[in-house]
C-alpha cells in the first residue's frame, strides 16, 4: 500500500493541473440570459425613439426610413450590421433577403423581442417585394404583437394580431391591427391592416450573432 501512494499523488496532481487549464463551465442558460438581456436592451433603445421624425441625427441611424430605423437600433448597441446587396429597389426587401439567405426568417411561431416583422403591399407598385419592416417589442396575452417602426408619422407603435388579421378592433374596442396602408382605388381587397399585410418574421439578432 505504501508503494501506491506516490502514484496516487501523481494522479491527483495531474487532475489538478488539467482542471486549472480548462475553461470554466458555463451553462447554456447563461447564454440565453445574456441574449434575453440584449434583446430587451434593443427593445428599450427602439422605444426611446418614439415620437421622433428625424432619427438620422443619431450617429447609428443612416436613413429616416423603416429599415434605417431597425438597423440603426442594432448599430446603436454596437452590433455590426453588414448586409449583402441584392437586386431590389426596397431596402426592407434587401434586409429580408439577407436574413432569408442564412435561414433566419420564419412564420407561424411566436416572435421574440427584437425580432423583425416584414410586410408586403404597403405601398403602390411594390409588387410582391417586402416594402416595410418593424421591430417586435412584446407579445400581449391575446397574441397581439406590438411593433415599433418608422413610418410617415415618425417612430411609433403598431399592433398586429394574426389570429384576427381582418379586425381593426376587438370586442372591447381595443386596437389589435393598425392601419398600415391608406385605401386607394388600386388597393387590393383586405390589404389595409397590419395583420393583412404581414409577410414574415426575421431574427436579426441571431443573424448577427450566429
What residue spans do the PLM features occupy?
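...with weaker cross-activation on analogous glycine-rich loops/strands in unrelated enzymes
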Residues: 31, 82-158
